[in-house]
């Protein structure tokens, strides 16, 4: 069965969450993000936020992140390498490799579409390197 999503309508339902931090709870994020549909072994999400997200990684596969509107800095850690900071903006897609820790800083706000595989792990602390903390699982 085909699934059709009207992304303009889905994003119009969301409110921009200002002041997001790595410790912002799911309840506090309500109304700023939405589960849109299942996809393969994962989920398609939409979100609108301003601030800084938590560190996360996905051991089951690569994550696709499309910047619908706005700009951000993507912090990413691959293997034993130092944290790399990469600017992203409207129209860009980032494919985050399986198991790579990553987070976004978006002080002026960003609208994202993500295709997230399977389970996720998080570090919900405001730290520079997630490898120094114990991850939480969803």
Residue ranges and their predicted role:
Residues 44-45, 53-55, 70-76, 93-94:
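Short beta-strand segments in beta-sandwich/barrel cores
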Residues 123-138:
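Acidic/histidine-enriched, glycine/proline-rich intrinsically disordered or flexible terminal extensions
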Residues 42-43, 61-63, 109-110:
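Short, surface-exposed beta-edge/turn micro-motifs
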Residues 1-47, 54-55, 136-138:
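A short, N-terminal "cap"/entry segment at the start of jelly-roll beta-barrel domains
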Residues 55-57, 62-67, 85-86, 94, ...:
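His/acidic/aromatic-lined binding-pocket segments of jelly-roll/cupin-type domains
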Residues 78-98:
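Short acidic-glycine-tyrosine-enriched beta hairpin
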Residues 49, 59-78, 115:
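Short, conserved beta-strand element in jelly-roll/cupin
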Residues 87-89, 98-126:
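Ligand-binding loop in jelly-roll beta-barrel domains
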